[in-house]
């Protein structure tokens, strides 16, 4: 039995003694101990593909901060890599895929990878982390969203214009839907395998959904997020594994996401939580949404923004703080001070206590 189940209870909108907190990219380059492991390992991919290293990095922030969850150390591009698109990282430029998808012929060659062969290292990491956590806090597994993965798979890496995928959306929408369906099948299998290996909550990162117009979002992102929420087997009752659908720029679609079948919606800092709570109408828990740049401020400024965020959620949720998981609106960045993270966690725990 979990010693700390605040996160799981909050994601189900159950009563908790205080608002739980975890942070996107809580294990990362802002931590000197992470940088030490990275230097010794020699590459990001070696860390992500070595279960013992992935476990060590996952646990690093838990040794520093009294967080309410661990999140698997991995990368959303492990699925495209397992599909044969040859993931590699270029220093200063980020991830690159050596075989980008540009036509229907390339899509027909893609297959959903076997989760216990091509992606066994991920499942082994999940199993090892669960063992090392020893039921102290829940472990969150994750995947990229179909749209976000398709962006990388078609562009071949990060992009400013997303010209290739947007051209496909306008000129060959059927081809893009073919790719999105294949990727959605892979995401569902990937999340199910993480759950079977021991993940106790799951999150989908729709990082690039916000680049789409409303019509395009409702065509190429939302339907596939909904498929995941409705088709991913997560159990029932108190044994149900909660799902969080997080998206940058998803504020206009919160009401629709709340009806998707997910347990929770993660939001960025470009919408007030009060507005997000009103739009979700009590159908889902909400996760977020402190501007990550707040961590560059003083501890007093951080505490002020924590209070404002907590109050904003309650104002849109009938005065109640139930159903809220505190998080950033996006991930930690390398220049952040671990002491300011300590100040953030302390402020959330102190100010949200019921």
UniProtKB/Swiss-Prot annotation:
Site (Transition state stabilizer): 75
GO molecular function: uroporphyrinogen decarboxylase activity
Reactions the enzyme catalyzes: uroporphyrinogen III + 4 H(+) = coproporphyrinogen III + 4 CO2
InterPro entries: UROD/MetE-like_sf, Uroporphyrinogen_deCO2ase_HemE, Uroporphyrinogen_deCOase
GO cellular component, one term: cytosol
Highest taxon listed in the record's lineage: Bacteria
Record EC number: 4.1.1.37
Binding site for substrate: 25-29, 44, 75, 152, 207, 330
Keyword terms: Cytoplasm, Decarboxylase, Lyase, Porphyrin biosynthesis
Pathway noted in the entry: Porphyrin-containing compound metabolism; protoporphyrin-IX biosynthesis; coproporphyrinogen-III from 5-aminolevulinate: step 4/4
PROSITE patterns in alphabetical order: UROD_1 (PS00906), UROD_2 (PS00907)
SUPFAM superfamilies xrefs: UROD/MetE-like
GO biological process: protoporphyrinogen IX biosynthetic process from glutamate
Signal peptide: none
Pfam families: URO-D (PF01208)
Location(s), subcellular: Cytoplasm
Summary of the function given for this chain in its UniProt record: Catalyzes the decarboxylation of four acetate groups of uroporphyrinogen-III to yield coproporphyrinogen-III.
Similarity remark: Belongs to the uroporphyrinogen decarboxylase family.
The protein's assembly and partners: Homodimer.
Name of the protein in question: Uroporphyrinogen decarboxylase
Organism: Xylella fastidiosa (strain 9a5c)
């Amino acid at each position: 039995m979990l010693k700390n189940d605040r996160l799981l209870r909050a994601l189900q909108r159950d009563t908790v003694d205080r608002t739980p907190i975890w942070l996107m990219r809580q294990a990362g380059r802002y931590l000197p101990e992470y940088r030490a492991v990275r230097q010794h390992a020699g590459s990001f991919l070696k860390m992500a593909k070595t279960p013992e290293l992935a476990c060590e990095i996952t646990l690093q922030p838990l040794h520093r901060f009294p967080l309410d969850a661990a999140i698997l150390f991995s990368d959303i591009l492990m699925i495209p890599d397992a599909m044969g698109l040859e993931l590699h990282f270029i220093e200063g430029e980020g991830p690159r895929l050596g075989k980008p998808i540009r036509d229907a012929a390339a899509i027909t060659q893609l297959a959903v990878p076997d989760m216990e062969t091509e992606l066994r290292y991920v499942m082994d990491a999940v199993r090892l982390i669960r063992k090392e956590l020893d039921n102290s806090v829940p472990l969150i597994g994750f995947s990229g969203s179909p749209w976000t993965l398709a962006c990388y798979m078609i562009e071949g890496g990060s992009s400013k214009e997303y010209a290739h995928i947007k051209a496909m959306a306008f000129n060959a929408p059927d081809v893009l839907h073919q790719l999105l369906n294949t990727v959605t099948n892979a995401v569902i299998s990937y999340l199910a395998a993480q759950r079977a290996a021991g993940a106790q909550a799951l999150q989908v990162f729709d990082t690039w959904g916000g680049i789409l117009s409303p019509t395009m979002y409702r065509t190429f992102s939302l339907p596939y997020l909904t498929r995941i929420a409705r088709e991913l087997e997560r159990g029932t009752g108190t044994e149900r594994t909660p799902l969080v659908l997080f998206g940058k720029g998803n504020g206009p679609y919160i009401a629709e996401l709340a009806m998707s079948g997910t347990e929770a919606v993660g939001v960025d800092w470009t919408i007030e939580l009060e507005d997000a709570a009103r739009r979700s109408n009590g159908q889902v828990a909400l996760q977020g949404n402190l501007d990550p740049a707040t961590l560059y401020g003083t501890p007093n400024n951080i505490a002020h923004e924590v209070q404002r965020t907590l109050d904003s959620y309650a104002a849109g949720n009938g005065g109640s703080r139930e159903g809220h998981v505190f998080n950033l609106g996006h991930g930690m960045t390398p220049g952040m001070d671990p002491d300011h993270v300590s100040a953030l966690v302390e402020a959330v725990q102190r100010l949200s206590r019921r």
